[in-house]
């Protein structure tokens, strides 16, 4: 069984910007352990004679060529913005100085 520590769960919650309780931390650790144990079943799958692939479907690029087009005027883009600064959208900070 793969053991997920409470420190790992707390770190994941921090990265996801989630505040979770002690009870939720324990529950999440158990859930992650179950998921990892289930995924570990792939280690025993017989892949003899199966060609390695990076995707299950044969993909082709169906995108168009990039072409520069005229965008909307800045004034129009910022018209309904809650807050602007120096001609840009201003949003609440999501990272502190240590993480930047």
UniProtKB/Swiss-Prot annotation:
Q: What class does this enzyme belong to in the EC scheme?
A: ligase
Q: Subunit structure, per the record?
A: Heterotrimer of A, B and C subunits.
Which protein family is it in? Belongs to the GatC family.
Keywords noted in UniProt = ATP-binding, Ligase, Nucleotide-binding, Protein biosynthesis
Q: Can you say what this protein is called?
A: Aspartyl/glutamyl-tRNA(Asn/Gln) amidotransferase subunit C
Species for this entry: Staphylococcus haemolyticus (strain JCSC1435)
Protein biosynthesis as a keyword?
Answer: yes
- GO MF terms held by the record: asparaginyl-tRNA synthase (glutamine-hydrolyzing) activity; ATP binding; glutaminyl-tRNA synthase (glutamine-hydrolyzing) activity
A single GO BP term for this record reads: glutaminyl-tRNAGln biosynthesis via transamidation
What's this protein's function? Allows the formation of correctly charged Asn-tRNA(Asn) or Gln-tRNA(Gln) through the transamidation of misacylated Asp-tRNA(Asn) or Glu-tRNA(Gln) in organisms which lack either or both of asparaginyl-tRNA or glutaminyl-tRNA synthetases. The reaction takes place in the presence of glutamine and ATP through an activated phospho-Asp-tRNA(Asn) or phospho-Glu-tRNA(Gln).
According to the UniProt entry, what is the EC number of this protein?
6.3.5.-
